[in-house]
Amino acid sequence: MKKTPLFEIHKELGARLIEFHGWSMPVQYTSIIEEHKAVRNQCGLFDVSHMGEILVEGPGALESLQKIVTNNVARLKKGQVLYTPMCKDDGGIIDDLLVYCLGQDKYLMVVNASNIEKDFNWVRDNSNQRTEVVNESDNYALLALQGPNSKKILEKVSSVNLDSLKFYNFTTGTLKGAEVLISRTGYTGELGYELYLSPDKAVEVWQALMEAGSDLGLIPAGLGARDTLRLEKGYCLYGNDIDENTHPLEAGLGWTVKFDKASFIGKRALLKYKEEGLSRKLVGFKLKGRGIPRHGYPIKDNGDQIGVVTSGSMSPTLSEGIGMGYVRYDKATPGESITIVVRNRAITGEVVKLPFI
């Protein structure tokens, strides 16, 4: 099993470690609810070094990326970040990822841990000959500092001017002598920063951040809280809410598909879905009774199955069962009453507009 550069720190902190896509990762340190609330109200620090980084560069890099992803990479200037799906010919989602514009003809794709090898092969095989594609995943550690106090904490240990750093923009600077790419991005819906750095500097930077945040409510946070935080904001998780059998339009990601772009992989299939209409849609829902919806639970209407839960949890913020799932398109309107089958119990739920908070 792979270990991040912070593995020993997680053990020292008493984290509960689990196997996650071939990595030993901290799912929680104290409790998911405590870590979740810290991120919403103060700050949390996550080790997400299991994520993958793929460098795409050369005179053909932009042309290759425009063909490979659905969003418009051409609009990126140096220092900007783009969220985009990457689709197959049939519109199915290979992965959802971030594209960083490092400079002219130089981009970094940040991909899900479960898909690194698959994505690397796909990007390499579908790039033109004037593009070099390199799997740089082993050369990066990735820390996510998330929560309302994240800016104050980061300013204590870095000389970078964060006032001018806008959402989905990044800059570079030094932190405890380490060269760091500081990105104003995250998976929590809070003010936050993601820090890309050399693996051999990860421990030093983690400790510096924890020390700087000691009087600002900073605590380490695991993958459990990361999941409940993203769910409350209605963010998709690859492998749960989206995969190769779902497409961006039904997943509520239509805003990332730029049909006015020249041809890209999946464009024809997605255009057909757009013209013919959707048969199902990813929705958010709340339970009206006690229970926790989980991935794979049936969604019914008058006894007929109309969909399936893709993500679900007890919301630490709302203290009620929330989830996302695909339902038949005619049942996807907020306010619709549905039934979730939780451990053979039928619990009434209601379709709601995302995000939950």
Swiss-Prot record:
Catalytic class of the enzyme: transferase
Annotated source species: Halothermothrix orenii (strain H 168 / OCM 544 / DSM 9562)
Reaction it catalyzes: N(6)-[(R)-S(8)-aminomethyldihydrolipoyl]-L-lysyl-[protein] + (6S)-5,6,7,8-tetrahydrofolate = N(6)-[(R)-dihydrolipoyl]-L-lysyl-[protein] + (6R)-5,10-methylene-5,6,7,8-tetrahydrofolate + NH4(+)
Any one Gene Ontology BP term: glycine decarboxylation via glycine cleavage system
Protein name: Aminomethyltransferase
Signal peptide stretch: none
Top-level taxon in the UniProt lineage: Bacteria
Molecular function in Gene Ontology: aminomethyltransferase activity; transaminase activity
Keyword annotations of the record: Aminotransferase, Transferase
EC number: 2.1.2.10
An annotated GO cellular component: cytosol
Family annotation (InterPro entries): GCS_T (IPR006223), GCS_T_bac (IPR022903), GCST_C (IPR013977), GCV_T_N (IPR006222), GcvT/YgfZ/DmdA (IPR028896), GcvT/YgfZ_C (IPR029043), TrmE/GcvT_dom1 (IPR027266)
Entry similarity comment: Belongs to the GcvT family.
Protein task: The glycine cleavage system catalyzes the degradation of glycine.
Subunit-structure text: The glycine cleavage system is composed of four proteins: P, T, L and H.
HAMAP family: GcvT (MF_00259)
SUPFAM superfamilies linked to this entry: Aminomethyltransferase beta-barrel domain (SSF101790), Folate-binding domain (SSF103025)
